[in-house]
């Protein structure tokens, strides 16, 4: 029963839509109505409000980190902690509070990885930052970082249970970016910092 409660709580925490909350706090339009339509930090940045985007980024990352950190402190096994990590991530992707239409999961995945293994999380975040700086496409950076995450995990820890969780997170994140991948291939993807479209 305790495990079930932990998983439900993690999912509900993941469902908290910080993009919506920060947009309301800063008097912005619903992020689902402009840009990519994605309720995430990159799309909120398209509103031109960097503070709102930062609040969204921190909030989304923090909920992923908090769910795993609390599960660790409660003494759950590694397998259960892995399930909690997946639950909070899926909560962000398919939030009950937004009719199961959530964000892409980049910030939440980063928070999860940092809680699971700080060095792994920082390595993956570093991959994202390098790609984002070099090419100015958040989606490309996310896809490359997601693909590299399980590879980095294998190099650091071998094919253990954590690597399986990281692999599932990576595949789900890439899947959520499928339309972005198509736009990248067509040369139609918006770059980081581009303003919202009317």
From Swiss-Prot:
Broad class of enzyme this protein falls into: transferase
Topology in the lipid bilayer: Multi-pass membrane protein
Keywords recorded for this protein, A-Z: Cell inner membrane, Cell membrane, Lipid biosynthesis, Lipid metabolism, Membrane, Phospholipid biosynthesis, Phospholipid metabolism, Transferase, Transmembrane, Transmembrane helix
Subcellular locations according to the entry: Cell inner membrane
Pathway involvement of the protein, from the record: Lipid metabolism; phospholipid metabolism
EC numbers, comma separated: 2.3.1.275
PANTHER family membership: GLYCEROL-3-PHOSPHATE ACYLTRANSFERASE-RELATED, INNER MEMBRANE PROTEIN YGIH
Function: Catalyzes the transfer of an acyl group from acyl-phosphate (acyl-PO(4)) to glycerol-3-phosphate (G3P) to form lysophosphatidic acid (LPA). This enzyme utilizes acyl-phosphate as fatty acyl donor, but not acyl-CoA or acyl-ACP.
Protein name (Swiss-Prot/TrEMBL): Glycerol-3-phosphate acyltransferase
Organism, as annotated: Dechloromonas aromatica (strain RCB)
Lineage: Bacteria, Pseudomonadati, Pseudomonadota, Betaproteobacteria, Rhodocyclales
């Amino acid at each position: 029963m305790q495990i079930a409660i932990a998983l439900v709580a993690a999912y509900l925490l993941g469902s908290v839509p910080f993009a919506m909350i920060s947009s309301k706090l800063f008097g912005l339009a619903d992020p689902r109505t402009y840009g990519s339509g994605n309720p995430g930090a990159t799309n909120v940045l398209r509103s031109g409000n960097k503070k709102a985007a930062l609040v969204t980024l921190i909030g989304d990352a923090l909920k992923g980190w908090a769910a795993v950190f609390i599960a660790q402190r409660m003494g759950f096994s590694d397998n259960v902690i892995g399930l909690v990590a997946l639950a909070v991530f899926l909560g962000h992707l398919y939030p009950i509070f937004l009719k199961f239409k959530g964000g892409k999961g980049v910030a939440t995945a980063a928070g999860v990885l940092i809680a699971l293994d700080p060095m792994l999380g920082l390595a993956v975040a570093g991959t994202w930052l390098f790609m984002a700086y070099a090419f100015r496409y958040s989606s490309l950076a996310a896809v490359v970082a997601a693909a590299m995450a399980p590879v980095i995990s294998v190099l650091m820890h071998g094919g253990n249970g954590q690597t399986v969780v990281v692999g599932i997170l990576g595949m789900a994140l890439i899947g959520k970016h499928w339309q972005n991948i198509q736009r990248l291939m067509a040369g139609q993807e918006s770059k980081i910092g581009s303003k919202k479209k009317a």
